């Protein structure tokens, strides 16, 4: 019998401030992204975490993207 997929899924977190920041504010080009897992049963809404953004060189809000 095949194993079920389970309730944990892999999600990508993207910096919310990198898209609106100008080139002068950024240390390097691009958008900061992290991958993590979340429990589908406990967290139905999109995940939001404060993570370090290497492009802006500070802690920023990272949101789950599709």
UniProtKB/Swiss-Prot annotation:
Family, as annotated: Belongs to the bacterial ribosomal protein bL33 family.
For this protein's source organism, the top of the classification is:
Bacteria, Bacillati, Cyanobacteriota, Cyanophyceae, Synechococcales
Protein name as annotated: Large ribosomal subunit protein bL33B
Which organism encodes this protein? Synechococcus sp. (strain CC9605)
Q: For this UniProt record, give its keywords in alphabetical order, as a comma-separated list.
A: Ribonucleoprotein, Ribosomal protein
InterPro entries attached to this UniProt entry = Ribosomal_bL33 (IPR001705), Ribosomal_bL33_sf (IPR038584), Ribosomal_zn-bd (IPR011332)
What biological processes does GO assign it?
Answer: translation
Q: Which Pfam families match?
A: Ribosomal_L33
Cellular component (GO) terms are:
cytoplasm; ribonucleoprotein complex; ribosome
Q: What GO annotations for molecular function exist for this entry?
A: structural constituent of ribosome
- Gene3D superfamilies xrefs: Ribosomal protein L33
């Amino acid at each position: 019998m095949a194993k079920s997929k389970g309730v944990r899924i892999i999600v990508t977190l993207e910096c919310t401030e990198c898209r609106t920041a100008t080139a002068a504010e950024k240390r390097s080009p691009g958008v900061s992204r992290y991958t993590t897992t979340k429990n589908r049963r406990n967290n139905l809404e999109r995940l939001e975490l404060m993570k370090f953004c290497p492009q802006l060189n500070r802690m920023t809000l990272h949101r789950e993207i599709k």
